[in-house]
């Protein structure tokens, strides 16, 4: 079974980094409502588009998701 996207993303936290992946990891960590137990692209993407209290470049999200799938 694949790790949830959130669990995988948390391994990329680095407040000193300017990489999109580290930025998203830090934002997701601070977002209490972020979907933590899913590996479903649509669920995470929909959350980022409609419910997140922060904005994030969805093109960068697509690239990060692809890296998650290749992990």
From Swiss-Prot:
SUPFAM superfamilies: YozE-like
Alphabetical list of InterPro entries matching this protein: UPF0346, YozE_SAM-like, YozE_SAM-like_sf
Top-level taxon of origin: Bacteria
Residue pairs linked by disulfide bridges in the UniProt entry: none
Gene3D superfamilies per UniProt: YozE SAM-like
Record-stated family: Belongs to the UPF0346 family.
NCBIfam families recorded: PRK13672.1
Name under which the protein is recorded: UPF0346 protein SPD_0837
Native organism: Streptococcus pneumoniae serotype 2 (strain D39 / NCTC 7466)
């Amino acid at each position: 079974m694949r790790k949830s996207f959130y669990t995988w993303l948390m391994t990329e936290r680095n407040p000193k980094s300017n990489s999109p992946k580290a930025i998203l990891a830090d934002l997701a960590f601070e977002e209490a409502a972020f979907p933590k137990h899913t590996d479903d692209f649509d669920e995470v993407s929909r959350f980022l588009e409609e419910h997140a209290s922060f904005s994030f470049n969805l093109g960068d999200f697509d690239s990060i998701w692809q890296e998650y799938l290749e992990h």
